[in-house]
């Protein structure tokens, strides 16, 4: 019996375009009249935000928008995380677009800027004045579980979800074992380390739809973006680009909400690309375990 696929060489249809450098990745895409965005991030892992003054940044010629949490129609969304399995179900968490009241982690987004050039956007970030009150924070998961531990989120407890895994008769297994080894094992978080940092361009089309051309593994984030802006879902369109690496790290929402907010505010196309350092700081990681 002759097979048609197994054992046959199949050409990789995009190989030549990639080796020749002809692929258009997210950051390669530009539009006329495009603005450039930057994100102001918290320099503290835990702090109260006492005041934010954006007046100097807004007064800088060439700056078209400076946004904080008060400018986001729906800044706090409840989101489902995880997958329903036989050992545990999805749990509900908070997706906060921009820090509000306090910051919960180093690098949490505090403000957004859109300007005529990348240099102007960076200068505008320097002019935003944020008054912080540093808080003690908590930096070890076992310490975070103790009664009275500093609450990272809005709840008094740092336990997001709890479930037990039971399989077989452990006591019988121990009784029959020749050797029992007990230890505590820690696995650190792992960065996905893709070559292409997070990037995208957003624009408004003639029908008033916000289009977001973004490096992502999940285009369904248009639903979240629509909720952030308080728009019907058919008013947001997410277009996935050629991906310069993902490995699961671009499954979570990254620049989409920021781009949509700035385009919605200015009416202009907006590009946002993270630096390598910003990508390492800001994007989701593979979870650590104990």
Regions found by a protein language model. Name each.
Residues 170-229, 288-289:
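Conserved beta-alpha junction segments in alpha/beta enzyme cores
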Residues 21, 65-69, 105, 181-185, ...:
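General beta-strand structural signal in soluble alpha/beta enzymes
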Residues 200-204, 223-235, 258-273:
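Proline/glycine-anchored alpha-helix kink/cap motifs
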Residues 1-158, 180-183, 265:
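Flexible, low-hydrophobicity surface segments
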């Amino acid at each position: 019996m002759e097979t048609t696929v197994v054992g046959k060489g199949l050409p990789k249809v995009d190989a030549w375009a990639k080796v020749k450098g002809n692929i258009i990745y997210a950051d390669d895409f530009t539009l006329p009249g495009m603005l450039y965005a930057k994100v102001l991030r918290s320099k503290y892992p835990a702090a109260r935000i006492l005041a934010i003054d954006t007046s100097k940044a807004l007064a800088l010629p060439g700056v078209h928008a400076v946004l904080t949490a008060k400018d986001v129609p729906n800044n706090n969304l409840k989101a489902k995380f995880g997958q329903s399995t036989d050992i545990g179900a999805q749990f509900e968490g908070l997706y906060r677009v921009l820090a509000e009241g306090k910051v919960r982690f180093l690098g949490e987004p505090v403000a957004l800027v859109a300007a005529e050039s990348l240099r102007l956007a960076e200068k505008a970030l320097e002019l935003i004045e944020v008054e912080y009150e540093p808080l003690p924070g908590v930096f070890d998961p076992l310490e975070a579980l103790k009664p009275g531990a500093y609450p990272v989120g809005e709840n008094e407890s740092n336990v997001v979800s709890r479930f037990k895994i039971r399989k077989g008769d452990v006591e019988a297994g121990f009784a029959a074992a020749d050797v029992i080894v007990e230890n505590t094992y820690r696995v650190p978080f792992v960065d996905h380390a893709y070559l292409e940092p997070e990037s995208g361009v957003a624009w408004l089309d003639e029908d008033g739809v916000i289009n977001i051309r973004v490096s992502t593994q999940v285009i369904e984030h248009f639903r979240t973006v629509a909720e952030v802006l308080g728009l019907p879902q058919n008013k947001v369109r997410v277009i996935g680009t050629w991906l310069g690496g993902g490995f699961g790290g671009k499954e979570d929402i990254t620049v989409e909400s920021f781009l949509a907010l700035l385009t919605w505010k200015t009416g202009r196309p907006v590009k946002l690309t993270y630096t390598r350092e910003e990508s390492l700081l800001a994007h989701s990681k593979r979870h650590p375990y104990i």
